[in-house]
Amino acid sequence: MKHTVSASVILLLTACAQLPQNNENLWQPSEHISSFAAEGRLAVKAEGKGSYANFDWTYQPPVETININTPLGSTLGQLCQDRDGALAVDGKGNVYQAESAEELSRQLVGFKLPIQYLHIWADGRRVAGAPYRILPDGILEQYGWTVGRTADSGGQVRTLQLNNGNLNIRLVFTEIGMPSETETPERCAARTR
């Protein structure tokens, strides 16, 4: 009898451990994403080569600005999106513009990066109205990218991992909160220079 109870408990625990995960509530469609300011580290791997940098990212609709910095804090470049399109400013002050951040990234680095969706995916949501698939492990597939996300106990993003087969991007968030600016900008700061 003792062995029967032990075997039953083991079978029950094994069965529970193998129940399929309910992914229905993962990656809900995007609605209004609140403003935020974040800092962290960024790693990009392409064709066996990797690059690392720090980032600070401010999302205040309609403006989104991502600064890429060296580990010592020098700015390597800035990407900004607003209603007028996207622009990038390199460390030498050269300005590049395009209709979208995706097109701008294709022009500058040769890859269409899904920059215009990062704030949605970082919030744990999918782009509403666009085709998607949620894999059994909870990974989102959208726009040709697999998107994984980890969060802290309060639901704030800790890591965001993107992969399209050729390019792997990993953002590790060390701080996330509200922007310090009290006024919401209407345009990218680089447009007003």
From Swiss-Prot:
Subcellular location: Cell outer membrane
InterPro entries with a match to the protein in the record: LolA/LolB/LppX, OM_lipoprot_LolB
Recorded GO CC terms: cell outer membrane
Key words, A-Z: Cell outer membrane, Chaperone, Lipoprotein, Membrane, Palmitate, Protein transport, Signal, Transport
Keyword Membrane on entry: yes
Gene3D superfamilies attached to this UniProt entry: Lipoprotein localisation LolA/LolB/LppX
Topology versus the membrane: Lipid-anchor
Coiled coil regions in record: none
Residues carrying lipid (N-palmitoyl cysteine): 16
GO biological process terms, semicolon-separated: lipoprotein localization to outer membrane; protein transport
Signal sequence interval, chain numbering: 1-15
Cell division among keywords: no
Lipid anchor positions (S-diacylglycerol cysteine): 16
Function of the protein: Plays a critical role in the incorporation of lipoproteins in the outer membrane after they are released by the LolA protein.
Subunit relationships: Monomer.
Protein family membership: Belongs to the LolB family.
Name of this protein: Outer-membrane lipoprotein LolB
Organism of derivation: Neisseria meningitidis serogroup B (strain ATCC BAA-335 / MC58)
